[in-house]
């Protein structure tokens, strides 16, 4: 609903990614069909990294996917949906890698403010750069090295 209330610049397309057993999946699909912007709802995807690389902005929880978004330099408005996400949210916001929002209204307010001030591209670029600097994206190699497995 928040995105539908904002006059987004350009020709935005909205992609919502959910788990295949998400309790609100059907309700979200129904709402996507009534959005003023073209919207699709995907469930149980196997190409999340690709979806992230073609996105300009993510709105998502400060859980484990937050690190994937950082690895790809994807600007993010993050929500804390569980207690164990609080420290991640604080750390990412302190690093300038994500901005924490508490409610859908706050999402709409932030976007409206950026658009009104013609700041969208600058804010997203800054968030993306900071996000990319949080992780080097070579975690697999680090784990392999720590396990003492020789390179192939």
What residue spans do the PLM features occupy?
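Nucleotide-activated sugar donor-binding and catalytic core shared by glycosyltransferases
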Residues: 1-152
